């Protein structure tokens, strides 16, 4: 089954930017585009506006206008639209589950808006079973020009980042872009090592060679699967969020992972993804992984 790329529309400038980003990505990947608008009836004092059918018509007209702006630029793109009356989070999560990715709009720095206002957005990102991409209102196609990289974070063992790396390499292959794979590392507490083990580490050149070996191992299968995608291995000491943000200016897209499991307090986005979402200027993809 071919999964579409789905854009969530709410009438804001941010969601229109997300719609056009999703359309360009669908063209690159040869996938259909689905546009979903969630609608809630809002009673007004005016008699005609109080009619649910009237309001639904307004929503449909706005959706059709937005889609026309897409098909004018991409006349061969297969586009489907849905106006759904229902609960926003559940509707978006259901749409994401059937999609290659869900694309939503967000403001630049600071709190996310539109679909991503407060708890709604946090819940969609935290619970989606497919990648969610957030696009800034000011994002333009020029930002995807040659020279800009797909930046992805890699942590832990090779299997820990497999889904995140797959998304990054597939995206870079579709765009003809370079992948910059960032692995951040920190010094462990000294008390975790005996003097003898520290001596052996010093003889081996310190901890960095071990981190470099782990990064190379994680990338090996993806280099083999995507031999035409240029790769930059970026190894740097520091917190993962800070290191990723330090190279955000190079990125046409940043890709971060999120553990797809629930804790005692519910699903969580994670501190690294949360920091990148709020402070990176480029579009950000959050990819769930085991």
Question: Residue ranges of each PLM-predicted region?
Answer:
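Protein-protein interaction modules outside structured cores
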Residues: 209, 232-246, 250-290
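A short acidic, glycine-rich active-site loop
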Residues: 52-62, 200-211
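Structural beta-alpha unit
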Residues: 1, 14, 53, 69-102, ...
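Small/aliphatic-rich secondary-structure junction motif
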Residues: 1-49, 148-202, 223-226, 230-231, ...
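Short beta-strand elements of ligand-binding domains
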Residues: 103-106, 132-137, 284-288
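Short, structured interface segments
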Residues: 121-141
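Glycine-rich, Arg-bearing micro-motifs that act as flexible, cationic patches
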Residues: 104-123, 145-147, 253-278
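General small-molecule cofactor/ligand-binding pocket signal
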Residues: 34-36, 80-84, 133, 180-182, ...
